[in-house]
Amino acid sequence: MYDLFSKYDIQKLHTLSSSQTNKAFAFHVQTPTCYFLLTKRENQGKIELYDSLPNKYITFKLHKNIPIPLDFSSIINKFLKLTNKYGRLDVIKTNLPKKGVKIIEHPNVKFPFKNVKTTTLNKNKAPELQIRYSNEELPFNNQPKIIMGHKMYGFPYIDKEGSYGICSRDNYVIINKELKEMELIKEFLSTEVILFVFETTRYRMRYLEKYVFEFIPDFSKIDDCWNMFDNNNVDIYKLFGITKEEKEFIKNYYKIKYKYF
């Protein structure tokens, strides 16, 4: 589908989220949809995407392997300025354990290995790791890492000692970082702006997609991030040049104010 979209000149593209699609089709369809104006000629390297934040079409440049956002391309364009300069945040999407591994809820002598299955929200809207135990050591055990286990919002958790393996699919893991780098990355990922950016690639219902990390820079490589972090003054809005009006829109986007690890 991406190759088809990028082959021809799509002059204007308007997307509908899963909830918008559901309403448009009398609550019978939930997959995100779109409509567009196409000219059958070679693409011009850009698309005019409808952006509901400024309520107008925004130019989005097409790049190989860079996804097309469903919305808020004005914000994504600001992210890509830093991502193109410093490189994207490298994440690993986890798979199911190999065949033959057994998983249980409570540990015993034969099942001593701790693993993260997923992350859920408690009644106070705070994230909690859901732990399971395996009879074999699973991937990422004994490896310091950031775990993003919530299937919609990630919610980064630092496993400093590498205490956990991962026993389920569709978790995201960041490895090969020093502890201070992980702390900095977690600080920037634990923001409403990042939750907002996650909305731009909800291609399958409301799941967190790996595609979105193509938009997000490696914060540990940016000097301004270190200056903010070292001075205990992380301002992700300032980092990306997000305006006062955009900031207000983002802060009002989520009715629920989530907590972080």
Walk through the language-model features, giving the residues of each.
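Conserved Class I SAM-dependent methyltransferase catalytic core
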Residues: M1-N22, Y35-L38, I185
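Alpha-helix boundary recognition
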Residues: F5-S6, S190, K251
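C-terminal substrate-recognition regions of SAM-dependent nucleic acid methyltransferases
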Residues: N22-E248
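Short, amphipathic C-terminal "tail helix"
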Residues: E245-F261
